[in-house]
């Protein structure tokens, strides 16, 4: 009986201690000084035991601007969030340069001050102009070690408007 009461108490504690965090992020992506148009920008909530959770997603407009708002729930703490960008501006060579475009992933940790408790953001994290050709990723926790050992890379079909890289 005592074990059942203890188990139920622990389950209720995890539900009661669940915390919600909200954020608003905006900025402009540039690639070599030119607005990076039509690129996906996402905000994720960092999870320790499971895959990170998508909070919000947007695509840059004709001037490279994006604006993301969203909230996420964590079981025990105010959620830690980060901006995630597939950085095709900092192109990496690929075995199929005429058909594939590859680039490093970019993670930018949001300061705790810009993740408000509750479902509504209280302030905006303004990234201003982010020059992707020189941007570097920020990793949290054990991911720092993983990033040191192996770099995350994303690939996509080369857009028809983008010429293949010059032969080197």
Regions found by a protein language model. Give the residues of each.
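Beta-strand-rich domain onsets/edges
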Residues: 2-35, 52, 135-168
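Beta-strand-dominated extracellular/periplasmic modules and repeats
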Residues: 11-129, 162-163
């Amino acid at each position: 009986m005592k074990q059942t009461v203890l188990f139920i108490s622990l389950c209720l504690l995890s539900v009661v201690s669940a915390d919600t965090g909200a954020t608003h992020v905006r900025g402009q992506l540039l690639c070599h000084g030119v607005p990076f148009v039509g690129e996906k920008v996402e905000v994720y909530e960092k999870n320790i035991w499971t895959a990170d959770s998508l909070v919000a997603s947007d695509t840059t407009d004709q001037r490279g601007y994006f604006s993301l708002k969203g909230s996420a729930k964590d079981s025990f703490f105010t959620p830690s969030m980060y901006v995630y960008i597939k950085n095709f501006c900092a192109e990496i060579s690929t075995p199929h340069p005429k058909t594939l475009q590859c680039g490093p992933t970019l993670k930018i940790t949001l300061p705790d001050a810009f993740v408000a408790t509750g479902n509504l953001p209280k302030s905006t994290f303004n990234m201003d102009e982010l020059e992707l050709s020189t941007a570097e990723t920020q990793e949290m926790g054990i991911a720092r070690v993983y990033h040191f050992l192996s770099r995350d890379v994303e690939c996509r079909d080369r857009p028809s408007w983008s010429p293949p890289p010059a032969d080197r």
